[in-house]
Amino acid sequence: MKKLLLLTASLLWAACLALALAATADAAPRAIGGFFKQTHQKNYMARDQRGEYNLLHKSVSGIGVDKELRASYPLLTKAINEINQGEFQRIEELSNRMKDEAAAFRETAPDYYHPFQYEFDVLMRRADTMAVSFLQYEYTGGSGVHGMYHWQGVNLSTVTGAPLPLEAVVRDKKALAGAICERLRADYPDSPFEQLEEKIVEKALTDQLNWTLDPQGLTFYFNPYEIASYAEGLLTATILFKERPDLFQGPCRQPAAAYAQPFPAYYPLTTSLRDNGERDVISVYEAKGSVHVVLNGTDNAFPVDLADLQPVLIHMEDGRNYLYIDGTRQGKSIRNTLVVQLGSRSARYVDTLAYSFRHTIAVAPRVQEYWHFLTNPNGFCIDQESPFISTSKTDICAIGENGTLTFG
């Protein structure tokens, strides 16, 4: 029965690909935009003999699509809405349990009490006329020694909204498992990785691998305790399409000529900047009033005082590569965007834009907070800098010849 279900899923995805190719005149995918997220934050309060106290702080984000994207891809919109509804229902049930647990913790250990925390966030990974891929991030902080977090990849057909099975992209799961193990041991040489091969092969053959479809390859995610200790954190393994062409199949292997790929700060992004299968590793962090871009082992520091970094890799048709790094000005509620051009090892400062991907609407009783996702460098929304408590103004832009914004 399991094999029959997998075969059925593969056949359905093959049909999805046929529809996608019929819907697009050219075989190569084109980047699409129009994705955003809305963030809701809430503090749940309670009262006991010691007074009023905070039970739980909850922050929840869900992916949204704009009017144009809804009209162009109604089935994708429906699938995303269903994913959101399912997650929001699960989160509501979980937060109710966490409130009960927090109240019990307050009663049994008042001297050690602290509010519980819950966060659910989303981050786009790829968006084009062939496939849409994004990450879900979940964090729970309770009465334990440390909180727990989890990253989960979601992969969908852009045309039909159907889930993308790994079989549609990978020829041989066992060979893929070997490549993942090889990559993990190369990227994390100090990790003992007990019984790594057995664990990864089992995950691959039982469809338990956690992955995203990136423009240049597949990235696999291993959360704390999955294959290593909690202290080692999230581990990732990226296999590039042109690095191992023997492993992959299907039209998803071809990236859009121009694309933008958001990625989490403090975690490395592996890609191929020249689209030739050669690995480029990028990471971004802030320290001592500077933003640091580490490119293929070379640390490039830029004296721009930003925090809470939200980086995006931008690849243009002519091969130019940029980072747009959105961040909060230290000590202020406004956000700006640092623009950096990437070479093979060095990064060059281009500009600091008085713009951010954060969009705010100042309405009672609280400010509504949205974030634009940059996935199509030839057309996207970005907001003029604005304090958090005010309504920000949105401009429609594209990436210009020098890496800065063009308007219209």
What are these regions (language model features)?
Residues 1-4:
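Positively charged n-region of N-terminal signal peptides that target proteins for export
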Residues 281-284, 321-327:
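Hydrophobic beta-strand segments that make up the repeating blades of beta-propeller
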Residues 9-20:
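Bacterial N-terminal signal peptides
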Residues 290-304, 338-355, 395-407:
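Surface-exposed loop/turn elements that mediate protein-protein interactions on large endomembrane-trafficking
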Residues 25-274, 285-292, 299-317, 333-335, ...:
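Compositionally biased intrinsically disordered regions enriched in Thr/Gly
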Residues 316-317, 373-375:
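Blade-terminus and WD-like Trp-Asp/Gly-His loop motifs, strongest in beta-propeller folds
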